[in-house]
């Protein structure tokens, strides 16, 4: 089986280099690494000279969806493609366990792993902290448990490429920039063609680095516009979208009272309100964030 790793990156040159070092330490190396940077400055080319697998730099317009789609097209000769965020550190056996999972069950089309610690919910982690958490993982090799999942978590997700290419199911480029919930959309559109699973032996740490993320205002708008756009296109249910939006609005209202320094809750709440106003006016569109 040929397994590629794809990373769409923007504004995280140093942490990307650290993440590539963790890929180089995998017990089962990727057969190819495809990097899609937002700009030429996002990649340390000198650092890539020493990695023990082929690397290709893939050009595309800026945005999570077009960058990832460019990687999919470039990786067409592979059997599977694992997308890692540039701030996700996989445990050393991640790709070995991925290969074993896909070979054991050919009906799996999407697999996601267990995030031991997710820095997105706090101020973020440094590389050394993430390495320590992986070393101290209390259950590094748990009894295998493969369970059905609604969708993969975008920081670590593996796709069998044949269904994507055969049915032309790509990331939706109408979701611009950070493209919040693009992982859910793609998974739900792939669900008729096989299983979507979470596997507890695919383990790693999401650092939740704050550099390179979209503004609070833009993200708040996407928290309303993107779920409703997915409802309209039929990839998710209205119930799912309302629950997601309601939770985010409530968090932003509460968080705006005494906001933490690492989350722009007030900016997100403003974005929520602008989106709700656009909804009432019939003008809601995920693409509006490009003008904010």
Where are the model-predicted features located?
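Short, well-formed alpha-helical segments that are part of the catalytic scaffolds
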Residues: 7, 11-25
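Acidic donor-binding segment of Leloir-type glycosyltransferases
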Residues: 20-59
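Active-site nucleotide-sugar/metal-binding loop of Leloir-type enzymes
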Residues: 65-80
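Conserved donor NDP-sugar-binding/catalytic core segment of glycosyltransferases
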Residues: 93-126
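Short, flexible, basic/aromatic active-site loop/helix in glycosyltransferases
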Residues: 130-150
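A short, conserved alpha-helix in the catalytic core of glycosyltransferases
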Residues: 152-159, 163-168, 173-202
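Active-site donor/metal-binding and catalytic loop motifs
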Residues: 178, 195-217, 227-230
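Non-catalytic, C-terminal membrane-associated alpha-helical segments of glycosyltransferases
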Residues: 217-226, 236-292
């Amino acid at each position: 089986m040929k397994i590629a790793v794809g990373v769409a990156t923007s504004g995280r040159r140093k942490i990307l280099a650290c993440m590539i070092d963790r890929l180089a330490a995998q017990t089962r190396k990727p057969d190819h690494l495809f990097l899609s940077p937002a700009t030429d400055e996002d990649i340390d080319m000198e650092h890539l000279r020493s990695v023990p697998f082929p690397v290709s730099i893939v050009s595309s317009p800026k945005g999570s969806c077009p960058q990832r789609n460019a990687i999919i097209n470039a990786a067409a000769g592979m059997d599977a493609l694992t997308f890692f965020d540039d701030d996700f550190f996989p445990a050393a056996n991640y790709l070995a366990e991925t290969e074993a999972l896909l070979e054991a069950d050919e009906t799996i089309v999407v697999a996601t792993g267990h995030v031991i610690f997710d820095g997105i919910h706090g101020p973020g982690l440094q590389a050394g902290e993430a390495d320590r958490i992986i070393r101290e993982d209390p259950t590094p090799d748990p009894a295998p448990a493969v369970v059905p999942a609604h969708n993969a978590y975008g920081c670590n997700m593996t796709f069998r490429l044949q269904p994507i290419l055969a049915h032309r199911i790509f990331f939706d480029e109408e979701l611009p920039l950070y493209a919040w919930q693009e992982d859910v959309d793609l998974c739900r559109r792939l669900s008729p063609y096989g299983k979507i699973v979470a596997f507890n032996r695919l383990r790693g740490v999401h650092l939740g680095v704050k550099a390179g993320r979209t503004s609070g205002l833009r993200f708040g708008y996407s928290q309303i516009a993107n779920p409703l756009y997915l409802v309209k296109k039929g990839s998710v249910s209205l119930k799912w979208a309302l629950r997601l939006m309601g939770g985010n609005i409530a968090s932003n209202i509460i968080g705006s009272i005494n906001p933490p320094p690492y989350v722009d809750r007030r900016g997100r709440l403003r974005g929520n309100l602008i989106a709700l106003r656009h909804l009432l006016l019939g003008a809601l569109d995920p693409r509006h964030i490009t003008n904010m």
